[in-house]
Amino acid sequence: NLHKKSDSIRILRQYLILLMAKSLHNCEKTNNYYHKLLIDNLLKEDLLKDTTFISANYDIHIDNTIAGLYKKDNPIMLDYGVDFTNFDFRHSWKKPQSPIVKLYKIHGSLNWLYCPVCNSLTITPYEGGIMRLLDNIDEAKCLACDEITIPIIIPPTYFKNMTNVFVSTVWREVEKTLRESDLLIFCGYSFSDADIHIKYMIKRVQTSRKKAPLKFMVFNSYEGKREDSKRKEEERYKRFLGEGVIFTDNSFEEFASDPVRFIKTIKI
C-alpha cells in the first residue's frame, strides 16, 4: 500500500531526526567556554549589539550563552527572529525588547517544538526540549492547544525541506541582515556542498546588494588539520565567493579569544 509505505518513511524520518537530536543532546554537556569568551569579548568592546549570529547548528551552546546575559545590570535579550507561544504566558520566555542580540537558527534548534495543529512554536529555554518527545511526551505538548509537538530539525542532506513557516521566516531575516552587513565571519564551517541553500542565498546577496561589497573571513582550522583539507576548503570558499575571501589559518577558539584583533585587519 503506497499510503502506508509513505507513512512508514515519514515515521522513519522522524525517528532518525530524534536519534540525531539525542546524539547531539548527549554532547551538550561539553564545555561552551569559548562561546562565553567570544560573547564576553564582543560585549567588552561594545560590538555585541552590532553582531548578528547565524547558526547552522542545532545545539544550544550559543543560545544559552546569549540568553545568560539577561540580568538587571545588563538586560540584553536574545531574539531568534520568530514568535513563540511562550510570549503569551507569564513567567515564561519573554518577547525580546531592545537591547537585543539576534541569533538565527537556519536549520532549526534542539530547543524548538513545533505544533502542526495550530502552527505555533514553543521554546524550551536552556533545555533541548526535543528530548521530551523521547523521555516524557506529556511535557512535549503545545502550550497553545495542548497537542503533541514535533521537532524543527533540518537534516544535513542535499534535499532540505524549508517550507515550515518559522524556518522560512528565519531565512528571510538572515537574507535581510546580510544585505545590511559589512562583514560575514564563518566559524567552524566547511562550506559543504550539501548546503546549497546557504551558498545561493549568500551569492544572491553578494550580487544584488546596493552597499559596498560584503567581506568574508573564515576561521575553521584546528590542531592537526591536514594541509590538503585546508587547501580544498579554501578553494571551495574562493571558487564560490571570490578571491577576496580572507581564509585564515586560525581556529574558532583563537578568534573567540581576541575577535577585535582579527576584525581590525578588515577595512570596512
Placement of each model-derived feature along the sequence:
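Active-site periphery "cap/insert" segments of enzyme catalytic domains
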Residues: N1-L113, V117, V165-D182, D193-V205, ...
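SIR2/sirtuin-family catalytic core signature
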Residues: K49-T51, C142-C145, K160-N161, V165-I268
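Glycine-rich loops and low-complexity Gly/Arg-rich segments
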Residues: D79-Y80, E127-R132, R209-A212
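Short C-terminal domain-edge/linker segments immediately following a structured domain
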Residues: F84-D88, L133-E139, L214-Y222
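Short secondary-structure junctions
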Residues: D73-N74, T122-Y126, F240-D249
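Short, basic, glycine/proline-bearing loop/turn elements
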Residues: A21-H25, Y158-F159, G188
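Cys/His-rich short segments
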Residues: P99-I100, K105-V165
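Helix N-terminus capping/helix-initiation residues
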Residues: N1, P155-P156, S251
